UniProtKB/Swiss-Prot annotation:
Residues 1-39, 108-127, 151-285, 319-454, 543-565, 580-730, 874-969, 1039-1167, 1184-1452, 1480-1544 are annotated as: Disordered. Residues 319-332, 340-351, 384-395, 443-454, 1356-1369, 1387-1399 have a biased composition (Polar residues). Residues 957-1039 form the NET domain. This is Bromodomain-containing protein DDB_G0270170. Residues 1-12, 1192-1204 have a biased composition (Acidic residues). One of its GO terms (biological process) is regulation of DNA-templated transcription. Pfam families: BET, Bromodomain. Residues 18-35, 164-185, 197-231, 352-383, 396-407, 417-433, 604-653, 660-686, 881-911, 918-961, 1047-1061, 1112-1167, 1205-1218, 1231-1334, 1370-1386, 1400-1424, 1432-1451 have a biased composition (Low complexity). Residues 1092-1107 have a biased composition (Basic residues). Transmembrane segments: none annotated. Residues 735-841 form the Bromo domain. The keyword Ribosomal protein does not apply.
Length: 1578
């Protein structure tokens, strides 16, 4: 039954009682008046006590006030009606009756609250509920709990009412006026609980004040008048009705006072009475007459709190970012709501700081009347000292935790504690008892049978303006008229209290930002063993002063490791406050305790913040009396959990004054920043009741310690006892493990890799695995991951601890899991592995014997020395043979002996220099296995063979650098067929190509060689294929076939071979050199070659380039002709006799070890030229210096170094040695050495330059005849044409023809002499005049580099046109770029200083090549202008490049044209090769597509067949089923014929019905079955 229904039932009962008893004796008017009055009284009481949406939540005080008002009303009515028959006894009875009625209504309301929890939710102002309301009903509750009331009118009063009807009717108007006048006086106590000292006829109406906790609303405000309908029940109006509309009820106080308006009749002399019936009598009356309904009053018994299961101890986890620990709700005015619900037992004593003293009538602010009465009565019996009591301070405006939900707190025995003090201005204190944690959700209002209350503490301190005065008031319903006076006094007290709170609310608004929520607490007495300390009460309170307190810093937030809803664990710091014996004259030590309300749990989580404060003045005087706990260091007093800013941390010492001490210099003695202490009070009486013993809980340790956060139970949880061994407390540091720990780590890694290791790699999570009792069984968990982290971080001091932790992992697993569990078995297997490997860890491995480092070095150096010695011997023989041959060739021609005396000795092979470089002795010059010109085609052929043999090793080493496309099986088959068709003379070359890559095993002499092309790699196959193609194209003459593989790159790659392969190669080369060197003649330059020794080349990095070892000033030996003609640029070259016997063979066959351009001495060509520049296609006039040997390290603007990789073309890489400096004394200054592989014939000619059927037009300068010299290798170079080289000032032309024409040569000499007469130059300053003698030239030694990427040509580079169509045009300006077999090769010859040399080496298949110019722009003023009569000389577009004499440049340009043709041919070959590869790829793709299509068709066919098969099977199955059905139908037909109608089987009947249903038309009539009725036997 809801609250409203209960109230309506009570009203109906009372209406029926009064109305039906008065029907026989009174008229309708009197009954109407009586019922109206009675309903009005009940209505007023109901409106006061109701806690639904029509009553203010603070109705407890209003109800209490209404009781007092009723008494005062009765008192006033009795004083005005002294002539009444009943007198004061009736008045007393009326008061008692009203109190009883109110109590019954309250009981009903409280019962309704239990069933209807939404009462407080529907209230608009739940923040101002006065919790003292629930205690009013306890006084007569026991007496009234078993009494049911039935109201009726007295028979005598009804008779008197009937006799006085006429008189009452006559005087009705007059009495009504008198009643209305008296009504204002009678109803005054109902509308205002006014103070007796200041009575007024029209007192002010108290309105609802939401900021007050005790404000009540008793003003009735309704706009509806009293209903006059007798039979209808009055509806409940709003909260109140105006006093002018209320019916006159109790007293009609007229002048004669002879008649009194009563409930039954207006003329009744007696007051209607209410008889109290026992439940038995009420039941009997209800049974006798249906007019009476017995409604028993049943009180709900208080539910006993169920015993909760034991809480699981849990480890608290500190977390900064968990939800805030307290809830703060504010009103519209910005004030904090005091959300203390009306269901708590704990009375809240509120007081706000008031800056102005209050009058004595306004100082009763601290207690609630009923509670204080109980405390006052119990005070004398409790004067002895008790253990410390926990006291909560709740300042107005903050929420009391865990009260808004209507949950009942844990009941405590009635132990009121009253600390009274004299009436002096006191500090505003808000004191409430600390609430205990409870899971009960019952409201305290439902616990009416318990009259016990929690201890109440009234604290007053004489420091501020308001005083706390306790006024005990005893309410005894059975007492005499003195009770009325006490009730009136209590009314005045409550009014003062309301006014005080109303005034304090205004102050609270101003100081809201400075108020904090604190809680006074005592130390945990369970941990104190000293009885003396227990007896000494420690009252630790915190008083806030709004003018000095800063807002409290946010507390640390915590989160449980597990669920938040299982239990409510209080978080406390390990360091707690310690109770200190406080003598009466000593100041009170203060601590602050912040009470927070968790948003989720709404639990009372209180964090004790110990701030042991000592007054500065008194601490010095009484420092002896303070226990040593007060002088704890700050780091113990201020635990790390507090998240306060540094400036807000209390200094903890008496010597550091705070802001409060600076501002408050008055009589109050302040302490640290967050506390203010009370002064000494000598007459303070402390009455503290001993708190009830709670369930034993582990308290925090007594002495503050700096430890991690623990739960309130002191960290008894096994989660907090997890083994810390092996765990790093600090961050893991970089630790260098000792050998024994390294072995431990290896053993641990072995355990990690074991197949049974996964369960032990990480820590056990009981909640994830569903083993919640794991930590009950396992006290010290451990896992391998933790052990590894600790081991790496240096967490283990000894190996025994490591072993102990490892064994702990296995023992834990075996302890928790039974022996049949797989984890137990896995742990056992891992433990076996550990125990087997751990002894090995303990055993120190024997240290290896110390190696003699010196001995190793000696052995290594000795091996290197042997290899170098062998190579030197072989190269000496090679050089001596080639030099002798060159000298003999020079002696054959008398015309140019002087000019080219040293050309043969100075010309050297680029490939041989790559392979090895000789180290000079004192003169320190280079020779790279110099190869010189041969006198005949046969000698040139043999020499080229020698050069190719020396370069074979480099080709094999560099083969890996070039990535060729994969050779297919078809290509291998085709290559094998082509090799079979080759002549027998070419087979040694094929074998040599294969031998160079060590692809064939060692063969015995004379044995048959079997070549399996399928076993060779692609590199060898590509070389063989290229060799075969060259033979087919006529590029390789049979008489000059090489015995080596095509050379690809420099010799730096040869060093990658091991020593054994080098030795074999060296032996092979020596044999070939000895065989090829026979018959060669010695030349006059043997002295030059014998004057220096060899140096083995050492590969250096790309960036280093080649370094000039030495260039002496005497290394240029000019001929007598050059000396007489002032060393003109024109040096006549005798092709193939003086220096270039092998030039053409080098270009075609890569067999020459010579440089095809023998430099003439150009030092004396120009007067202003000090620099000797040897560039890509030019060299200064060094008649005897090979083009690759004269190197200096003058910086160049673009240092292009790119060596050929596998294509063996000198034009494929350009070198610049400007990065390096000469370490020798005779270094020439400002030499710009740009060495291009195009100038240096390195055994690479065979693979790139094929001068087949090329017509090199050499223009004879005297006769102006174009003599075609065909470098046709297929014709063995038998075409002897004009092979004379004309050397201008800037161009050293190297003729590449094998045969020589003496007549033409002599003509060239004459022309050169004419040029000499025109051009007179002086030797460079760096050259001594004595050096121009016939001394042998000492070429420098060159250290070559590995391949370097080509650099772009700078803007100062001259662009030469190599287009053969421009050989007869004078203006050929555009530079042509051609591509090699694998990449583009840009040929941009750089004309820098004076002479131009051709690039005698063929074009390789290497990457982009450019010929760079030096940084210094060559001078052009000293160069002779071109001859205008020659139309065929090429022109130069670059303004920085010099001009050349037209009569001497034809042969050079023809050479470049031929080279350009070769590049084009190579490009064509490359394109063809790419086309072939593309076709192969397309064919493969087509084959793959065909295969995929074939597979797809096959899959479709398979699917189709499977589908057809399924269809056939389904058809067969269907036919079978149909046949079975047909047979069944036939059988049924036969059975039907055999059986009669009356003997039809059930199956047959069902079949008939089924067939009928199948055949029936859907639109036809429904099936009507006539069923035989079954006779019921019953």
């Amino acid at each position: 039954m809801s609250l409203e229904q209960q109230d309506e039932t009570v009203v109906e009962e009372e209406t029926k009682t009064s109305f039906e008893t008065n029907n026989s004796t009174a008229n309708n008017t009197n009954n109407n008046t009586d019922n109206t009055y009675k309903e009005e009284i009940l209505k007023s009481t109901e409106s006061i006590t109701r806690n639904d949406d029509k009553v203010d939540p603070t109705s407890a005080t209003a109800l209490e006030k209404d009781i007092i008002n009723n008494g005062e009303y009765s008192g006033s009515s009795s004083s005005s009606g002294n002539n009444n028959i009943n007198g004061s006894n009736n008045i007393k009875n009326i008061v008692i009756e009203k109190v009883e009625q109110l109590e019954r209504v309250v009981v009903n309301n409280n019962n309704g609250d239990e069933n209807n929890k939404d009462i407080h939710d529907s209230s608009n102002n739940t923040e101002d509920i006065d919790i003292s309301k629930s205690h009013i009903i306890k006084y007569d509750k026991d007496e009234m709990s078993t009494i049911s009331t039935i109201h009726y009118s007295d028979d005598e009063s009804s008779k008197e009412k009937q006799d006085n009807i006429n008189s009452n009717n006559n005087n009705n108007k007059n009495k009504n006026e008198q009643i209305i006048n008296s009504e204002n006086i009678l109803d005054t106590p109902m509308t205002e609980a006014s103070d007796q000292t200041t009575p007024s006829d029209t007192p002010p109406t108290l309105t609802n004040n939401t900021s007050s906790t005790t404000t009540t609303t008793t003003t009735n405000n309704t706009t509806t008048a009293a209903t006059t309908t007798t039979n209808s029940r009055r509806k409940r109006n709003s909260l109140s009705t105006p006093s002018s509309e209320m019916d006159p009820v109790l007293d009609s106080t007229s002048e004669n006072n002879t008649t009194r308006k009563t409930r039954g009749s207006r003329n009744s002399k007696k007051e209607p009475e209410e008889l109290l019936l026992t439940p038995e009598q009420a039941k009997e009356l209800s049974n006798k007459s249906k007019k009476w309904i017995y409604v028993p009053i049943i009180e709900a018994e208080a539910k006993k709190e169920e015993v909760l299961p034991a809480k699981r101890d849990r480890k608290q986890v500190f977390n900064e970012n968990i939800f805030s620990s307290s809830r703060k709700s504010t009103t519209k005015g910005g004030e904090k709501k005091n959300d203390t619900a009306s269901t708590t037992n704990t009375p809240i004593i509120t007081a706000q700081q008031n800056t102005t003293p209050l009058s004595p009538t306004q100082t009763t602010t601290t207690t609630t009347t009923p509670t204080t009465t109980t405390a006052q009565q119990n005070t004398p019996a409790q004067t002895e000292s008790k253990p410390p009591t926990t006291i909560s301070i709740n300042i107005k405006g903050s929420k009391s935790p865990k009260t808004t939900g209507g949950k009942q707190q844990k009941p405590t025995p009635p132990s009121p504690v009253v600390i009274s003090q004299p009436v002096v201005p006191s500090t505003p204190v808000v004191a409430t008892t600390k609430k205990t944690n409870s899971r009960s959700k019952r409201s305290t209002a439902n616990n009416n049978s318990e009259t016990t209350q929690t201890p109440e503490v009234v604290i007053s301190a004489p420091t501020t303006t308001t005083a706390a005065i306790t006024t005990p008031i005893n309410i005894t319903p059975s007492s005499d008229s003195a009770t009325i006076q006490q009730l009136q006094q209590s009314i005045s007290m409550l009014e003062d209290k309301i006014r005080l709170i109303s005034s304090n609310n205004k102050v609270a608004t101003e100081i809201l930002n400075n108020t904090i929520t604190t809680t006074t607490t005592t130390a945990a007495t369970s941990a104190i063993k000293d009885e003396e300390i227990i007896e000494n009460t420690e009252l630790q309170t915190t008083f806030t002063k709004s003018s000095t307190l800063a807002p409290p810093s946010s507390e640390r937030k915590y989160s449980n490791l597990y669920s938040d809803d299982e239990d409510d664990t209080e978080m406390v710091d390990v360091s707690v406050s310690i109770p200190i014996p406080i003598p009466i004259p000593t100041p009170t030590q203060t601590t602050t305790k912040k009470t927070t309300l968790s948003k989720k749990r709404k639990s009372n989580t209180s964090t004790i913040i110990p701030t042991t404060t000592i007054q500065q003045e008194q601490g010095q005087e009484q420092g002896q009396q303070q226990p040593p706990q007060q002088q704890q260091p700050p780091q113990q007093q201020q635990p790390p959990q507090q998240q306060q800013p540094p400036q807000q941390q209390p200094p903890q010492q008496s010597t550091s004054p705070s802001k409060t001490q600076q501002e408050n210099t008055s009589s109050t003695t302040t302490t640290t920043t967050t506390t203010t202490t009370t002064t000494n009070t000598e007459d303070t009486t402390t009455v503290i009741d001993k708190k009830p013993k709670k369930k034993p809980r582990h308290s925090a340790p007594l002495i503050p310690q700096i430890k991690p956060r623990l739960p309130l139970n002191g960290g008894s949880s096994e989660r907090a006892q997890r083994s810390s061994r092996g765990r790093m407390g600090k961050a893991m540091r970089d630790v260098v493990l000792t050998p024994v720990f390294k072995r431990c780590l290896d053993l641990l890694e072995e355990l990690f890799e074991h197949q049974h290791s996964p369960p032990f790699l990480v820590a056990v999570d009981p909640y994830a695995l569903g083993i919640l009792d794991y930590f009950d069984v396992i006290k010290h968990p451990m896992d391998l991951g933790t052990i590894k982290a600790s081991l790496i971080g240096g967490g283990y001091d000894t190996i025994d601890k490591f072993a102990e932790d490892c064994r702990l992992v296995f023992s834990n697993a075996k302890t928790y899991n039974p022996s049949t569990n797989p984890v137990h078995i896995m742990a056992q297997s891992l433990e076996d592995v550990f125990e087997k490997g751990f002894p090995k860890v303990l055993i120190e491995p024997p240290s290896p014997p110390p190696k003699n480092v010196d001995q190793e070095k000696i052995e290594k150096l000795s091996n290197d020395l042997k290899n170098v010695t062998k190579e030197l011997e072989k190269f000496k023989k090679d050089d001596s043979n080639s030099i002798n041959n060159n000298n003999n060739n020079n002696n054959n021609y008398n015309n140019n002996n002087n000019n080219n005396n040293n050309n043969s000795s100075s010309s050297s092979s680029r490939s041989s220099s790559r392979k090895s470089h000789s180290s000079g002795s004192s003169s320190s010059h280079r020779s790279g296995s110099s190869r010189s010109s041969r006198g005949s085609s046969s000698s040139s052929s043999s020499s080229s063979s020698s050069s190719s043999s020396s370069s074979s090793s480099s080709s094999s080493s560099s083969s890996n650098n070039k990535k060729y496309p994969k050779v297919t099986t078809e290509e291998k088959t085709k290559l094998g067929a082509e090799i079979t068709q080759l002549p027998v003379d070419l087979l040694p070359s094929i074998l040599q190509i294969i031998h160079n890559t060590n692809s064939l095993p060692e063969q015995k002499p004379g044995s048959e060689v079997v070549i399996d092309l399928m076993k060779f790699d692609d590199d060898i196959l590509r070389r063989l294929s290229k060799f075969v193609e060259q033979y087919k194209n006529g590029e390789i003459p049979q008489h000059a076939l090489p015995l080596s593989a095509p050379s690809s790159t420099h010799s730096s790659h040869s060093s990658s071979h091991d020593s054994s392969s080098n030795i074999r190669e060296i032996e092979k080369l020596q044999k070939q050199l000895d065989r090829l060197g026979k018959g060669q003649q010695n030349s006059s330059s043997s002295s030059s070659s014998s004057s220096h020794s060899k140096r083995i080349s050492k590969p250096i990095s790309k960036a280093r380039g080649r370094k000039v070892i030495s260039t002496s000033s005497s290394n240029l030996n000019n001929s007598s002709n050059n000396i007489n003609n002032n060393n003109n640029n024109i040096n006549n070259y005798n092709n193939n006799n003086n220096y270039n016997n092998n030039n053409n063979n080098n270009l075609n066959n890569n067999n020459n070890n010579n440089i095809n351009s023998n430099l003439n001495n150009n030092l004396n060509n120009n007067n202003n030229k000090d620099d000797i520049v040897i560039d890509g296609f030019k060299k200064e006039n060094f008649s005897s210096i090979p083009e690759k040997d004269v190197e200096t390290d003058i910086s160049e603007s673009s240092d292009s170094e790119s060596d050929s990789e596998s294509g063996s073309s000198d034009s494929s890489s350009s070198y610049s040695d400007s990065d390096f400096s000469d370490s020798d004394n005779d270094r020439r200054r400002n030499y710009n050495n740009s060495y291009n592989n195009n100038n240096n014939n390195n055994n690479n000619n065979n693979s790139s330059n094929n001068f087949n059927n090329q017509n090199n037009s050499y223009n004879n300068s005297n006769n102006n005849n174009n003599n075609n010299s065909s470098n046709n290798n297929n014709n063995n170079n038998n075409n002897n044409s004009n092979n004379n080289n004309s050397n201008n000032n800037n161009n050293n032309v190297n003729n590449n023809n094998n045969n020589h024409n003496n007549n033409n040569h002599n003509n060239n000499i004459n022309n050169n002499n004419n040029n000499i007469n025109n051009n007179t130059t002086q030797p460079s300053p760096s050259q001594q005049s004595t050096s121009l003698t016939n001394e042998p030239i000492k070429p420098p030694t060159i250290l070559q580099t590995v391949k370097k990427p080509a650099l772009p040509v700078t803007g100062s580079v001259a662009s030469w046109s190599f287009d053969p169509t421009n050989n007869k045009e004078s203006s050929s300006s555009s530079s042509t770029s051609s591509t090699s077999s694998t990449s583009n090769t840009t040929l941009t010859p750089i004309i820098q200083q004076s002479s131009l040399t051709h690039a005698s080496s063929p074009i390789s298949s290497s990457t982009f090549v450019s010929f760079s110019s030096s940084s210094s722009t060559p001078p052009t003023n000293n160069l002779s202008p071109p001859s205008p009569g020659l139309p065929n000389s090429p022109s130069i577009n670059s303004p920085s490049s010099p001009s050349a004499n037209n009569n001497n440049t034809d042969s050079a340009w023809n050479h470049f044209k031929a080279k350009n043709i070769t590049l084009k041919q190579k490009e064509k070959e490359r394109v063809l090769q790419e086309e072939v590869l593309r076709k192969e790829r397309e064919e493969k793709e087509e084959e793959l597509k065909k295969e995929e299509e074939k597979k797809r068709i096959e899959m479709e066919e398979i699917k189709r067949l499977a589908k057809e098969k399924e269809e056939r099977e389904a058809e067969e199955t269907r036919k079978q089923i149909e046949s079975e059905r047909a047979a069944a139908r036939e059988a049924r037909e036969k059975e039907k014929l055999n059986n009669s109608k009356g003997n039809m089987s059930f199956q047959y009947q069902m079949d008939v019905m089924a067939s009928f249903e199948d055949n029936i038309d859907s639109s036809g009539s429904l099936l009507n079955l006539q069923l035989k009725p079954i006779e019921d036997p019953l």
